[in-house]
Amino acid sequence: DSGPDGKVSIPENAHVLPLEGRLVMPGLIDTHAHGQQAASGFIPQQNWVDYARLGFGVTTVHDPSNDTQSIFAASEMTKAGLITAPRTFSTGRILYGAAGSYKAEIDSLDDAEFHLERMKAVGAFSVKSYNQPRRDQRQQIIKAAREMGMLVVPEGGATFMHNLTMIVDGHTGIEHTVPVEMIYGDVLDLWRGAAVGYTPTLNVAYGGLGGENYWYDVDEVWRNDRVMAFNPPHKVIPRARRRTTAPIEDYNHIRQARITKKLIDQGGLVQAGGHGQLNGICTHWELWSFVQGGMTPFEALRSGTLHGAKYLGMY
């Protein structure tokens, strides 16, 4: 039950919290949250990455690029109550299209189905199509994903013509910023009509200085007790205390954030993704950056909660 104080029956053994003047909200959902889950195959019983996230109210994360063995093992241990962490989901290892030791060769629908089947078997409900160079390769991944009920979140790749074909072909969303300063009605109409989400990761925005640089610049992050309680000093001090500075007009993430405002005004879906830059607070940096681009605080919080749940198929 819910209602005014004095009109709701409260059990005698209930723990009552004084919340006058405070905001009660759902846990934040970070849909692009990188973070190490193991070292040399060993999963720590207490992972500072997860503690930092929980310490800042991030209760669900989706990591679109992580080590397959460690991330899904950690996720299952979390579900079993063996470790304390946010609800953890991931694509596992990316489906990498360039040359390398873990290249995912995709030259047919059968190839795409093979790769998605092996990822689904270890616990993935999403895959990251990462720099597959040809459009038909990306389309084969999408078709296989539709057949298997999986999501496809592509690496944006800082290539605008690729981003547009990703939207047209029906990817679940675009990860990372589009590499242009402004989009206009034609792209907005296309994007809205395709119902493709957008996780801009403004902390590492393409094309110039990103949000992470800005928040280090204007805030004495190392004086934040919660940041320092959960993050190792060597992860904070070098960037926070000996930070660089720049004029406000040099911060490209603000221009990129204006695109996110245009999208939500057109009914688009924009999610928060802190990119794991400084776990915990980086998700909040993303929300604050949304507001710099014109979102209201409510719209930013909606992107960090409801939009993330919709994007991941949880709502």
Predicted regions and their residues:
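Active-site-adjacent beta->alpha loops and helix N-cap segments on the catalytic face
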Residues: T68-A74, N131-R146, M182-G193
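Histidine-rich, glycine-flanked metal-binding segment
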Residues: D1-M25
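Active-site neighborhoods of metal-dependent hydrolases
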Residues: H115-P133, P179-G293, F298
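Metal-associated gating/positioning segment near the N- to mid-region
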Residues: R22-L82, A98-Y102, D110, D136, ...
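Alpha-helix-loop-beta-strand connector modules within alpha/beta enzyme cores
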Residues: E76-I94, R138-G157, A195-P200
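Histidine-centered divalent metal-coordination motifs
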Residues: R22, I29-Q36, V153-E155, E175-H176, ...
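Acidic, glycine-enriched loop/beta-strand segments at the rims
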Residues: G3-D5, I281, T296-R302, K310-Y315
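Divalent metal-dependent hydrolysis catalytic cores, especially in the metallo-beta-lactamase
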Residues: V49-Q69, A85-L95, K120-Q132, L151, ...
